[in-house]
């Protein structure tokens, strides 16, 4: 027994030394960022230099200006509202060619943890770059003509603007109910979260259910590493079926960033990427939920070692990561069956019926057909168990 305990201790020590703990493994610490390190843009014109964070009012105005300036390329969707009534917005961007039916849908979503605002800034700048480059950059024009890109720069506005709409200095991880939104999704492998499903997450689930996203990423901060499924298991316990694909995608992302700054993405693993559960096992996370239930491949991008970068460093992070962020969108065209968006497709132990139904749906089992009448049910997403496999039905 003594030898076993010693061996366990030595193994635990080696593992702990091999990689940095996940930033959300520890309790929150008091605010340490000096207000002098953060400059806020109080007008649209001040934001044009891209060396500031926007106030909440400027953020909303920026999203509207994208639509006003490029109405033929984008429109604004309201995903929902936060606990305190702030809008959760998504900008849908696509080109003007005629093959709209066959464009796969891509999704970027940032700042689920309100104090991790690097992605917030990067997503706003990405929106601006995609729109301004259409028609002048052959690469971007081709991408938009073949892809529908939805970008949600800020998914936890109450956490980001906890100190008031004028500043991000006192941003916090949680929403206004002090719930960690990345521990609040239904867990396909475990139990439901302790807290009720929060308005921000309910809105996000409904929004994703109305789309056919094939590839997505949610953006975080506090470390620099590409975190791919599963979060609920170590790679020893259960490999994601796309494990090797994820490794190659992550490697391409990291390698692209290191062409600009070779020191990036080294504070967790030397490779710059890791299976989420190998870093730190969590339950009720967004990544596993969307991968399992929504026929989409989503990863977690930890983009900066500092959760809230000083504004003097923002431009460097954009220069380092912008090409990688764009190239990740292009990965959607390397997926199998990209042209069959909206068609029934197998995913692990689940089949997905994404086409809306207003009444009954018939699902083919191995030995029989099963009819489910949803006519008296409210609109929403239904996860049904048919002969031991999960089936998703979306009702409008």
How does the language model describe each region?
Residues 344-396:
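C-terminal outer-membrane/trafficking sorting elements
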Residues 100-112, 116-244, 248, 259, ...:
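Active-site/substrate-binding loop(s) of hydrolase catalytic cores
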Residues 54-106:
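Soluble metallo-hydrolase cores and metallopeptidase-like ectodomains found primarily
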Residues 1-4, 395-396:
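Positively charged n-region of N-terminal signal peptides that target proteins for export
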């Amino acid at each position: 027994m003594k030898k076993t305990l010693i061996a366990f201790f030595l193994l635990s020590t080696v593992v702990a030394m091999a990689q940095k703990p996940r930033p959300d493994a520890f309790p929150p610490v008091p605010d340490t960022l000096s207000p002098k390190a953060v400059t806020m843009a109080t007008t649209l014109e001040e934001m044009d230099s891209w060396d500031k964070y926007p106030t909440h009012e400027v953020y909303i105005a920026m999203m509207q200006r994208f639509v006003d300036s490029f109405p033929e390329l984008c429109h604004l969707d309201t995903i929902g509202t936060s606990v305190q009534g702030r809008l959760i917005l998504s900008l849908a961007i696509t080109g003007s060619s005629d093959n709209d039916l066959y464009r796969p849908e891509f999704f970027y979503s940032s700042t689920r943890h309100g104090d991790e605002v690097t992605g917030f800034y990067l997503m706003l700048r990405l929106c601006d770059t995609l729109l301004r480059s259409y028609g002048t950059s052959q690469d971007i024009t081709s991408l938009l003509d073949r892809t529908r890109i939805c970008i949600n720069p800020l998914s936890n506005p109450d956490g980001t603007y906890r100190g008031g709409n004028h500043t991000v200095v006192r941003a916090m991880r949680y929403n206004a109910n002090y719930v960690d939104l990345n521990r609040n999704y239904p867990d396909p492998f475990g139990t439901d979260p302790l807290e009720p499903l929060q308005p921000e997450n309910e809105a996000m689930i409904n929004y994703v259910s109305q789309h056919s996203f094939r590839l997505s990423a949610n953006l975080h901060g506090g470390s620099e590493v590409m975190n791919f499924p599963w979060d609920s298991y170590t790679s020893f316990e259960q490999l994601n079926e796309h494990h090797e694909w994820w490794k190659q995608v992550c490697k391409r992302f990291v390698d692209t960033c290191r062409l600009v700054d070779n020191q990036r993405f080294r504070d967790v693993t030397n490779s710059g990427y890791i299976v989420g559960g190998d870093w730190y096992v969590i339950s009720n996370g967004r990544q596993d939920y969307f991968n399992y239930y929504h026929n989409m491949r989503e990863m977690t991008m930890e983009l900066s070692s500092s959760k809230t970068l000083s504004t003097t460093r923002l431009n460097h992070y954009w220069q380092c990561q912008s090409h990688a962020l764009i190239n990740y969108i292009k990965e959607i065209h390397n997926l199998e069956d990209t042209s069959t968006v909206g068609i029934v497709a197998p995913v692990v132990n689940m089949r997905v019926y994404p086409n809306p139904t207003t009444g009954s749906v018939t699902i083919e089992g191995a030995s029989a057909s099963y009819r489910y009448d949803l006519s008296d049910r409210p609109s929403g997403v239904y996860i049904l168990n048919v002969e031991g496999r999960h089936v998703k039905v979306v009702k409008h």
